[in-house]
């Protein structure tokens, strides 16, 4: 019985060497055939011709899986890729960083969000390559890397079939539109391949293996924190089996990336997870643990860690939530199919494996089709948006926020973000954190008016498209008619409402001239403190008309001399260009931005990346 445990790099065969099912390998030059005195040695095999070598490579599982994945992702691009669902969010982020590549804060959604809180890498890569092109590339490469791992692990007796199961799983990921997660998984599978497919002749160069695996693990987490969580499961399984070098190589970098990004670009929110969502990933983690051979210790431990982690995710609210199901959707089928040759045909275990594998693929296939149907945007979003945009521009909607009742496709999050600041967007964690009334059954005419005032909403758009689950009550409330909403325009696709007596985005003595995704321009009529209803971040800065960050308040020379004589003496600052404070307001504890304006004039707020973020006021001026 071959060992089904994935080999350590020191056990793994060299890529150019043949590997038997026991995981041992011998070079062609050292392999000999025992002979009897009466039997002469066999003649040496004829060298492989280029045609034979090409034929062998074309039939290799990695080649077949990669080619199949490439073809299927091209078909996805032409026939199934749309502009709704997760694709809408990724389109919005890619367009934002394309228009504002140096901005650390996107003001088009939820008052303000850091691009890094979504992904460090994917918005910029998608902006360059295109969202759908990125999906085709990462799905194809991930399928090829998965096939490589399956070929190199001696325990896998049916690598081609398992590789094709992986191709189907990555195709379903594309059908659901998860480009950012797919990008992270490409790097994650690459990191795992570096650990498990390390060449035999380099088996003692563990530092080199770590130098390859760790950056890939960091890129995986920087692309998608959920992909980093997958690496955490693999690292935990390796660590528990005392395979520490591999565990450290792929497990430490994700922790560092998550910690650093959370410190520099804080974000909080909760991704919901229902009991129905919990059931299937836990079920398949149990099936993998029970049905694979008992000596597949690493696989079984990973399944157990994943199952426990899924239960904890359900019990403890977090930003992961239902996203944790994606790991089972990608790899449970591969593990179950790899275990099939170890079961006696037509035994109970064999039938259980077949049924589990079929059930897994039915689940991910049905979920993908459901995602396509549910998130397909109405044609009006692509063909008849211009009249709505024209009306928003005519009424000056760019001076406040606009609430577009979220459609099931969430197409509004990308279609209108370039033109106005949206009160909402497409990030479930942020929506539940900042707008809980849409989820906790507290929405009524009074609370809705309070919410409109809280976020300085000046206009409300009601699409005729089917609303999102978190917007059904809102759409019904608006349709009923509210005294503080006045319909000012409509056609067969949209209704536009003006909010009567809206709360301004910036309090007097300031007026907002323009509020866009990349910044806000306000005119201050007299010096003083101005409350601006933008969630505070350390990256917000004041810039001049050329976009250059203005000088921060400077300590006076007299104050510096006083501090030399007495460290406890109060400091004095000259605030020449203005500075920004964080202030709390309202019953929700909102942390808004306050401008300390030293003189009348025009002030511009943006959030450029810089070593000393923002234009904060010193404590003495706060």
Describe each region flagged by the PLM.
Residues 145, 167-171, 183-203, 209, ...:
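Specific aromatic-rich, kink-prone transmembrane helix
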Residues 74, 81-90, 100-103, 110, ...:
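Transmembrane catalytic cores of multi-pass membrane glycosyltransferases
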Residues 109, 196-209, 240-248, 336-352:
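Membrane-interface junctions at the ends of membrane-embedded or membrane-associated helices
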Residues 74-161, 165-185, 189, 225:
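Active-site lumenal/periplasmic loops and adjacent helix-entry segments of GT-C-fold
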Residues 1-13, 19, 28-75, 621-622:
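Start-transfer (signal-anchor) and selected internal transmembrane alpha helices
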Residues 368-622:
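Extracytoplasmic
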Residues 140, 182-193, 284-286, 331-337:
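Alpha-helical transmembrane segments of multi-pass membrane proteins
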Residues 347-371:
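Internal/C-terminal transmembrane anchor helices
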